[in-house]
């Protein structure tokens, strides 16, 4: 059985002066080597959840437990932050070094890591995100996707238990988004890294292992992507779209082209259409 890395139990939070709760009675677990996406329209509570998990705010009720032992509180917040690494949406705002290597080792220098160990962590982190050939490049010379991969490397160098992506692909072009999503999938599959992705991009969420839908501060639904995106009517009712491949598949079914599976990518959909055509 996989080890539980993060658990929220009945957490609630209300901003001062607000009439309603931003989060209400939210409970879920995150397991080792799992990629979970949290989706929801604006105002659903996604950003508030990210702030709570990183200890920027503390829940008014309920608990957040990391690695099955550490409960988030004012006393433990700095220890929790060592276990949870965050990558934010604007890659340009995350660079603090003049080169890729300067940026990745910045956090390591701050904790006084010996140089030999720091170089080892630097090279390992850049290899994980396939940016080892850009060691001495300046940030302005990189694409958006490359910048986010360097930001991920900077977090991985600190070896947190959990990687949280807070709208990390929202400001990227399609190619940049693909680069980041492919990197995340590789980190999960090959290295067993645990990822929580807070996103409005349903194409990205469709690639994860599990999806949590937040609506008005509460968990509306939770399940594997195939299960979640079957309920396209429910998603549209709360202001969310569905992946393009799901839309196309639904149109085909209305035209009596019966498909066996829920297709979360165009590649998967095209492959089944090709098989159907080959049988004729």
From Swiss-Prot:
Function: ATP-binding (A) component of a common energy-coupling factor (ECF) ABC-transporter complex. Unlike classic ABC transporters this ECF transporter provides the energy necessary to transport a number of different substrates.
Record-annotated ABC transporter domain positions: 6-241
InterPro entries: AAA+_ATPase (IPR003593), ABC_transporter-like_ATP-bd (IPR003439), ABC_transporter-like_CS (IPR017871), ABC_transpr_CbiO/EcfA_su (IPR015856), ECF_ABC_transporter_ATP-bd (IPR050095), EcfA_1 (IPR030947), P-loop_NTPase (IPR027417)
Family matches, as SMART domains: AAA
Family: Belongs to the ABC transporter superfamily. Energy-coupling factor EcfA family.
Record-listed ATP binding positions: 40-47
Species for this entry: Bacillus cereus (strain ZK / E33L)
PROSITE patterns: ABC_TRANSPORTER_1, ABC_TRANSPORTER_2, CBIO
Name of the protein in question: Energy-coupling factor transporter ATP-binding protein EcfA1
Pfam families, A to Z: ABC_tran (PF00005)
Keywords: ATP-binding, Cell membrane, Membrane, Nucleotide-binding, Translocase, Transport
Origin: domain of life: Bacteria
E.C. code: 7.-.-.-
Oligomeric and partner information: Forms a stable energy-coupling factor (ECF) transporter complex composed of 2 membrane-embedded substrate-binding proteins (S component), 2 ATP-binding proteins (A component) and 2 transmembrane proteins (T component).
GO CC terms in record: ATP-binding cassette (ABC) transporter complex
Protein location: Cell membrane
Main subcellular location of this protein, as a coarse class: membrane
Molecular function in Gene Ontology: ATP binding; ATP hydrolysis activity; ATPase-coupled transmembrane transporter activity
NCBIfam families cross-referenced by the UniProt entry: ECF_ATPase_1, PRK13635.1, PRK13648.1
């Amino acid at each position: 059985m996989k080890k539980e890395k993060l658990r929220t139990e009945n957490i609630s939070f209300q901003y001062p002066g607000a009439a309603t709760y931003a989060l209400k009675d939210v409970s879920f677990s995150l397991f080792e080597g799992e990629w979970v996406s949290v989706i929801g329209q604006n105002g659903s509570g996604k950003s508030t959840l990210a702030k709570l998990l990183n200890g920027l705010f503390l829940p008014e009720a309920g608990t957040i437990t990391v690695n099955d032992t550490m409960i988030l509180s004012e006393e433990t917040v700095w220890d929790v932050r060592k276990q949870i690494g965050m990558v934010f949406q604007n890659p340009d705002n995350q660079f603090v070094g003049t080169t890729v290597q300067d940026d990745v080792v910045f956090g390591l220098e701050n904790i006084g890591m010996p140089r030999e160990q720091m170089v080892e962590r630097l090279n390992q982190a850049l290899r994980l995100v396939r940016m080892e050939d850009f060691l001495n490049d300046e940030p302005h010379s990189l694409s958006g996707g490359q910048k986010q991969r360097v930001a991920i490397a900077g977090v991985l160098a600190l070896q947190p238990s959990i990687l949280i992506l807070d709208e990390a692909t929202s400001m990227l072009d399609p190619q940049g988004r693909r680069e980041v999503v492919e990197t995340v999938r590789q980190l999960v599959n090959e290295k067993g890294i645990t990822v929580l992705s807070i996103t409005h991009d349903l194409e990205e969420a469709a690639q994860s292992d599990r999806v949590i839908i937040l609506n008005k501060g509460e968990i509306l639904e939770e399940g594997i992507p195939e299960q979640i995106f079957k309920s396209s009517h429910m998603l549209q009712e709360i202001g969310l779209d569905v992946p393009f491949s799901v839309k196309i598949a639904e149109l085909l079914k209305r035209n009596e082209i019966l498909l066996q599976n829920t297709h979360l990518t165009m590649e998967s959909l095209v492959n089944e259409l090709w098989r159907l055509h080959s049988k004729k």
